[in-house]
Amino acid sequence: MENPDDRYLWKTDKEEFFPKLTVYELAIGFFRFLIFVSYTLCSIPLFLLAKILFNQTGIKKPMVIIRRYWSLVTLRLCSLKIKVKGTFSSEVCLVVCNHISWLDILAIQSIADVVFVAKSDVKNWPGLGFLAKLANTLFVERNPQKIGLHSEQANVILSNGNSVCFFPEGTSSDGLRVLKFRSGFFQLAFNSLGEKKVNIIDIQPLSIFYEPKNSDMRIDFYGWWGNMSLFLHILKVLCKSSGIVSLNFHKLLKSDRFQNRKQLASKAEDIIRDELTFNIEKSRIR
C-alpha cells in the first residue's frame, strides 16, 4: 500500500494545483513584487549597518526590529494577516514547528527572535538563499557523518543566548497533516553547552496553520511540497493570496522530564498534530 506521506518527500511527479489568474491579479502580483524588492533593497543596508555597529557589543535589538518589520511587511504584501496565541519563551529554548512553506519563516520571524535551521540546499536558492545567510541561518546537510558538526554549531548558538528553531518533519507538506518527527536534533535538549555546562534546554512546540479567506482558494493553497516550483508558488501567493496565518506558541516541554530525545519528539509531535487537527476542523465548520 502506498504511504500517503510519500508525496511530501520531494520526489512526487504529481501536477501541482495552480489557480487561473486574471490580468488584474497578475498586475496586483507584479505591483506587490516591486514593493517587496524595493523594501528589501532598503532593508538590507540598514540590517548590515546595524550588524556592524552592534554585533560586537551583543546588542541584538536593532537587527531583530529590522528583520521583524521586514517579515511583517512581506506577509502583508502576500495579503496574510497574522494571529498569535500563546507567548514565545523568554528563555533560551529549541522551538519546533510543523512545516508548510517558505512563508513559515516570515511568520515566525515576525514574532520570535530565533536562529533557523535549514537544509543546505536553501543557501543556493536565488535571492532567498542570500536572505537566509544574512539572517545567520544554520545550514545542515542530510549526512549522518555531519551530525556531530551540526550539533556543535547549534550548541554554540544556544550557549550564546539564542533560541534555535527547526522543522523536525524534515520537509514541508500541504498544511493539512503533520509528518513523522525526526528525533535527531532533539538531542540538543540534552547536550552540554560550553563552559556553563548547562545540559538541559527546554522545547517549545509551535503549531502553524494557514486559513485561506478567498472562496476559490483550496485549503492547501499555502502548502508547498514535493517538486513544486518555488517561483510559481511565490507567484500565486502574490497574485491571489488572502488569508490568516495562525501561530500557537505552546507551553515549554521540560526536557528533564523525558528519558530521551525520541520521547521528547513524540510529545511535541502529538501537541502540534492535535492543534492542527483542531484548526482544520474549526475552519471547515465555518
How would you name each of these model-derived features?
Residues 137-163:
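A membrane-cytosol interface segment of integral membrane proteins
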Residues 14-83, 130-134, 240-242:
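A transmembrane-helix-recognition feature enriched in membrane-embedded lipid enzymes
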Residues 154-155, 162-164, 168-177, 181:
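Soluble extracytoplasmic domains of inner/organellar membrane proteins
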Residues 47-53, 57-63, 77, 93-145, ...:
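Catalytic core of membrane glycerolipid acyltransferases/transacylases, capturing the structured
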Residues 1-18, 70, 77, 81-85, ...:
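Soluble, non-transmembrane catalytic domains of enzymes that act on hydrophobic metabolites at membranes
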Residues 92-94, 163-167, 202:
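Residue-level preference for the first positions of well-ordered beta-strands
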Residues 127-129, 143, 175-259:
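A cross-family acyltransferase "interaction/gating" segment
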